[in-house]
């Protein structure tokens, strides 16, 4: 996946914010998506993505499957966050996931550095007690990271829990 243009991230941020706010009012997710779709800029690709999300949601009941299939538009990390919220065995709430996605999209609109992106995503894993292995695998696929970063992230994924995060961060200096 390549990085999207700024306007796409701005619209994604609005989309996730609107979903979060309207779900709090107990509106059905498909209905909310249909209404929000009409509010999104038609010059972006998000309305098409919303159509696909709605179709997959009505077919399988899961939004994360569509996000994974739309890997050219949504990052693996975004799909992972939604999949974690959809996991019936987990404790991660969809409303929290939508907040995470909103902040992620708004953050990406500012063209953040790889360091900032990593720490935002890693903090999301830690604060919400999400699966480190699956989460770091998703982070590895982020278009923000180049080959050196991917090598370091692979190392982190293998060593997390065995080595303190501070030592892993210090190892980054040598890349």
Task: Enumerate the language-model features and the residues they cover.
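Catalytic metal-binding core of the metallo-beta-lactamase
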Residues: 1-173
């Amino acid at each position: 996946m390549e990085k999207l243009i700024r306007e796409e991230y701005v619209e994604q941020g609005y989309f996730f914010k609107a979903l979060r706010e309207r779900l709090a009012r107990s509106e059905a997710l498909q209905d909310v998506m249909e209404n929000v779709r009409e509010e999104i800029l038609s010059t972006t690709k998000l309305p098409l993505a919303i159509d696909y999300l709605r179709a997959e949601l009505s077919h399988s009941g899961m939004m994360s499957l569509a996000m994974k299939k739309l890997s050219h538009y949504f990052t693996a990390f975004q799909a992972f966050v939604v999949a974690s919220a959809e996991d019936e065995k987990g404790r991660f709430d969809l409303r929290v996931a939508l907040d995470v996605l909103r902040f992620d999209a708004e953050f990406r609109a500012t063209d953040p550095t790889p360091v900032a992106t990593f720490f935002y995503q890693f903090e999301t894993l830690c604060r919400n007690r999400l699966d480190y292995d699956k989460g770091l695998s998703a982070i590895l696929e982020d278009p923000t990271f180049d080959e050196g970063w991917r090598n370091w992230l692979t190392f982190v994924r293998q060593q997390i829990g065995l080595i303190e995060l501070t030592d892993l961060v210090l190892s980054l200096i040598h890349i």
